[in-house]
């Protein structure tokens, strides 16, 4: 059931035309503010509803928008759907943080998701998709991969797991079979890819590893906002090629 059919929405006060065709979506709205103020020229705040800040400006003369997604599949599901369906956005790149899920992954590695696994029923309820794996846009991933070659960033490409629970009790349970393929754990990409598939749009996901349960390492909240510059730059350089 759809409760709303146009812009602005109950969650986004931006007017039609306020967003660029390509939007970068960190989870944290304060990270969106930091990126806009640090990297964009003529950045204008186009949404403040519920504190989910969104900005549109120029990067190297090209229009780019940045908006927080909030945490988790439902939040990303709402905001990315509205951007695609009501604001004419064509491309969304999630730029987030993640936990390492493989011994080969190190802190601060940047991972480009080629697919997202989840046990969530989001896609089934939203559009009837019954699988547990959704792909990123191959077109966007190709642009991001090619763009990374002109940087000193080591980009790791592979699967991520998009979970629905952050805090969970320790129980004896068998991991999902797909976990042996997964390089990082995050909480939003499955909803983004589901919306892109349902609406005929494009979605990609870049994450920087900021937590490692095996070693106990983790970044502080301030570091998560300011220490992810290589990923931010890669996303912006890729965005202007889309």
Regions found by a protein language model. Name each.
Residues 130-179:
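Active-site rim beta-loop-alpha module in soluble metabolic enzymes
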Residues 190-223:
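Zn-dependent metallopeptidase/amidohydrolase metal-coordination segment
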């Amino acid at each position: 059931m759809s409760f709303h059919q146009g812009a602005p929405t109950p969650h986004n006060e931006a007017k039609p035309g306020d967003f660029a065709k390509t939007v970068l979506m960190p989870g944290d709205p304060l990270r969106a503010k930091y990126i806009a103020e640090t990297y964009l020229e003529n950045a204008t705040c186009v949404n403040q509803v519920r504190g989910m800040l969104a900005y549109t400006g120029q990067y190297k003369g090209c229009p780019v928008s940045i908006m927080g997604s909030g945490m988790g599949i439902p939040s990303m599901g709402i905001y990315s759907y509205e951007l695609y369906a009501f604001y004419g956005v064509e491309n969304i790149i999630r730029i987030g943080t993640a936990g390492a899920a493989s011994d080969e992954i190190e802190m601060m590695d940047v991972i480009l998701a080629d697919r997202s696994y989840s046990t969530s029923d989001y896609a089934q309820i939203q559009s009837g998709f019954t699988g547990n794996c959704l792909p990123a846009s191959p077109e966007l991933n190709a642009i991001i991969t090619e763009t990374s070659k002109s940087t000193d960033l080591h980009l790791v490409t592979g699967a991520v797991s998009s979970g629905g629970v952050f805090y969970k009790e320790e129980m004896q349970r068998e991991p999902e079979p797909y976990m042996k393929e997964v390089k990082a754990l995050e909480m939003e990409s499955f909803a983004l890819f589901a919306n892109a598939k349902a609406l005929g749009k494009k979605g990609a996901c870049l994450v920087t590893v900021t937590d490692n349960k095996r070693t106990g390492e983790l970044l502080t909240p301030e570091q998560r906002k300011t220490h992810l510059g290589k990923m931010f730059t890669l996303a912006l350089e890729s965005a202007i090629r889309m």
